[in-house]
């Protein structure tokens, strides 16, 4: 039986067995919160009239859980997004995409979209702190973004200076990863002052990836290890995963959840090593429109997944 026929029969049987009234056809289009919560538990005991291995059923179950924007909740009120406190991701990586498209859609200059980075990140930090999230790593400017027009790059560099001045007294700890030496000197000074001033802040840690790329991070870590080995500071036999991670610029646990706004579904050279076992969530919402409801939806989606880290929990 080919995979498309198996999937079709699977969803028909699932609809009947679980009494999912919102499924009008053989594939899920909209599902209520209450219906979604118990699906995975019921899948384990569901008897389907299919000739399929347990592994095949698990694959379809996983495929179902990985739907992001395709599973639409019937009620979008924030209060109805019941998050489990014990399953809140400790570290969220954030690709803030869609600022330029947001501005263009409103007939504005692209700079107007970029300007919203500061208030929007403040909002996300405030919500994240209340939810118990410990770290937010936000992708602000990549090593490839230098290819943009000089006017846009100059505007962004000035905007980042304003950003760090704003976050001096916002109450969160701020640190920067990326190649700072290539940034304007005035921006480097703003970064140094903000990192020093906020290093003692408790609670949320906001990491800004600025002139950062995953390739760059892996290469600089490799060069550092090679240099130490050549100077007799470590033996080649001592090189392992833990040692390598100590040389990466991110000095905190790897992200549990990656959120990318703006509809694109790729990581764009962001935290390539660190995202090995991170759960991905992609949303069509443009970053300037991304708010509390959207963040909670992403976290709820994360909480409904089975994180196996290469193992098997079924």
From Swiss-Prot:
Cofactor(s) annotated in UniProt: Mg(2+)
Subcellular location field: Plastid, Chloroplast
Cross-referenced InterPro entries: UPP_synth-like (IPR001441), UPP_synth-like_CS (IPR018520), UPP_synth-like_sf (IPR036424)
Entry-linked PROSITE patterns: UPP_SYNTHASE
pH dependence as annotated: Optimum pH is 8.0-8.5.
Domain of life: Eukaryota
Cellular component per GO, a single term: chloroplast
GO molecular function: dimethylallylcistransferase activity; magnesium ion binding; prenyltransferase activity
Tissue: Expressed in stems. Expressed in petiolules. Expressed at low levels in leaf trichomes, old leaf and roots.
Catalytic activity entry: 3 isopentenyl diphosphate + dimethylallyl diphosphate = nerylneryl diphosphate + 3 diphosphate; isopentenyl diphosphate + dimethylallyl diphosphate = neryl diphosphate + diphosphate; neryl diphosphate + isopentenyl diphosphate = (2Z,6Z)-farnesyl diphosphate + diphosphate; (2Z,6Z)-farnesyl diphosphate + isopentenyl diphosphate = nerylneryl diphosphate + diphosphate
GO BP annotations listed: plastid membrane organization; polyprenol biosynthetic process; response to cold
Keyword terms, alphabetized: Chloroplast, Magnesium, Metal-binding, Plastid, Transferase, Transit peptide
Enzyme Commission number, as recorded: 2.5.1.142
Transit peptide: 1-61
Enzyme class label: transferase
Active site: 97
CDD domains (alphabetical): Cis_IPPS
PANTHER family registered for this protein in UniProt: DEHYDRODOLICHYL DIPHOSPHATE SYNTHASE FAMILY MEMBER, NERYLNERYL DIPHOSPHATE SYNTHASE CPT2, CHLOROPLASTIC
Family: Belongs to the UPP synthase family.
Role according to the record: Uses dimethylallyl diphosphate and isopentenyl diphosphate to catalyze the cis-prenyl chain elongation and produce the 20 carbon product nerylneryl diphosphate.
Record's protein name: Nerylneryl diphosphate synthase CPT2, chloroplastic
Organism expressing this protein natively: Solanum lycopersicum
């Amino acid at each position: 039986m080919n995979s498309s026929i198996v999937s079709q029969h699977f969803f028909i049987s699932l609809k009947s067995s679980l009494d999912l009234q919102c499924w009008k056809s053989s594939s899920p289009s909209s599902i209520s919160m209450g219906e979604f919560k118990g699906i995975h538990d019921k899948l384990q005991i569901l008897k389907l009239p299919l000739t399929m291995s347990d592994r095949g059923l698990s694959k379809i179950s996983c495929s179902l859980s990985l739907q992001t924007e395709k599973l639409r909740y019937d009620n979008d009120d924030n209060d109805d997004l019941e998050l489990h406190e014990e399953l809140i991701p400790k570290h969220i990586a954030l690709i803030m995409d869609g600022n330029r498209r947001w501005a263009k859609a409103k007939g504005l200059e692209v700079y107007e979209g970029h300007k919203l980075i500061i208030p929007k990140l403040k909002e996300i930090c405030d919500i994240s702190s209340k939810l118990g999230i410990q770290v937010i790593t936000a992708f602000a400017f990549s090593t490839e973004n230098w290819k943009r027009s000089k006017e846009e790059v100059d505007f962004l560099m000035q905007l980042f200076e304003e950003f760090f001045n704003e976050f001096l007294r916002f109450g969160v700890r701020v640190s920067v990863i990326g190649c700072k030496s290539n940034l304007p000197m005035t921006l480097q000074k703003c970064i140094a002052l903000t990192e020093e001033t906020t290093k003692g802040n408790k609670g949320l840690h906001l990491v800004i990836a600025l002139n950062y790329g995953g390739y760059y991070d892996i290469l600089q870590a490799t060069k550092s290890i090679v240099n130490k080995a050549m100077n007799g500071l470590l033996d080649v036999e001592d090189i392992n995963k833990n040692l390598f991670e100590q040389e990466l610029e991110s000095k905190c646990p790897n992200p549990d959840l990656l959120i990318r706004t703006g509809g694109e579904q790729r990581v764009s050279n962001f935290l390539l090593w660190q995202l090995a076992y991170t759960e991905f969530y992609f949303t069509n919402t443009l970053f300037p429109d991304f708010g509390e409801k959207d963040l909670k939806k992403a976290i709820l989606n994360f909480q409904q997944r089975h994180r196996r880290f290469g193992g098997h929990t079924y």
